[in-house]
């Protein structure tokens, strides 16, 4: 690497880290204070939803993705809001009824969860959608089943993700179809990612999955699409363009960006 490349890398890293990380409090000793309550024993909690009974937080424990680090496995966890303790959910494998029949999973296959979403389906069941990066790029579907002191996960199917997409987050509809945010190319380098974080060019867009097909949502292009949240009743989806430094309100009927913040 040349001296100029090194200088550029350091400058880009400093700029991006200042924008996205900011000041951090040392919580390595897992001690709370009068401003911050620290709950220990969780590993890389990435995305969080509250369970239907409002008694637990369910979360994905992120493994890792490129270009920041090597892809590796993670898992899932529940936080009991009353006892402040961690619970590892039980997972069982059943018939694939909510995914692509060509996609399969075995009991011993590891998980690499990223973005998640939980919705009450039209049939009354609770469906959890998971963006999964390990060992393969898939969308995993689970039914959440209430138990006495926890929630269990029943695998109900998956969808293989084509190489052209690299997903971050998912928003489910009540009929089992969904939207997902495509971040950027899978083979993006760290230098390229840092450069985009400075110049804010478009890298990805929103994808809709229905009729067992992925389809781009026109007009949703932006820099680093990240977290998304769907209001199905109004056909509005909120998109966090991470590298673009904005949260955008997007109309799914007109395929137009209505408003943005930051």
Identify the residue ranges that each predicted region occupies:
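Blade/loop signatures of beta-propeller domains
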Residues: 8-34, 149, 191, 199
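A short helix->beta-strand "capping" segment at the edge of beta-propeller domains
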Residues: 19-44, 98-102, 152-153
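Beta-strand-rich domains and repeat architectures in extracellular enzymes and scaffolds
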Residues: 37-75
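Beta-rich, blade/repeat-based domains predominating
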Residues: 42-52, 95-120, 155, 160-178, ...
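Conserved beta-propeller blade signature
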Residues: 56-58, 127-129, 177-179, 236-239
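Short, conserved, GDST-rich strand-edge loop motifs in beta-rich repeat architectures
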Residues: 59-74, 130-131, 180-201
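Blade-loop segments of beta-propeller domains
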Residues: 63-66, 71-122
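Short loop/turn segments that connect beta-strands within beta-propeller blades
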Residues: 80-84, 144-148, 209-213, 251-256
